[in-house]
Amino acid sequence: MSAAHNPLRPPMTRPTGRFLLAHPAHAIALGFGSGLSPKAAGTVGTLWAWAAFLALQPWMSEARWGLLLLISLPLGWWACSVTARHLQAADPRCIVWDEVIAFWLVLWLLMPTGWPEQLLAFGLFRYFDAAKPGPVRWADRLYHDMDPSHTRHGWAKAGWGILVDDLVAAFCTLLLMALWRTF
């Protein structure tokens, strides 16, 4: 049994570059390193998502973005589930793939738009993700009141729990952006 799976060993407090490279799921879940930030990993992961979106934009059509998001959701669920299990934590702060998928969704549905709207969307998304008002708090609590450590099925549920609140934060961001655009 490896140290990452040993229930007698305390959970890792903060992953390292070695942990990131130890499994493909870790690299994905940790946002290809952006989740290793010692402070504000969610914000750093969202900034990485924004930069990656802009870098990929010249080669992506609407259909390609849709396909990438459809692939990224189950891939992200798997990566988040595996990484959370290896870290022995239901929703480690270093896992930022949830921010990546959710902010890509926001940008995909907002584009084309200029820097001011992208910046506003970034700020709103970070607010909803960090403060977890109303519906985001509800989504966060759906899965986080459980102890996933006993079963593999529990870790699979933890993976969805990591993703769901960020998707609700993306929806709230898009709703406010739509209201802002109408006025």
Locate the predicted segments by residue:
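Hydrophobic alpha-helical transmembrane segments
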Residues: 2-89, 93-95, 100-183
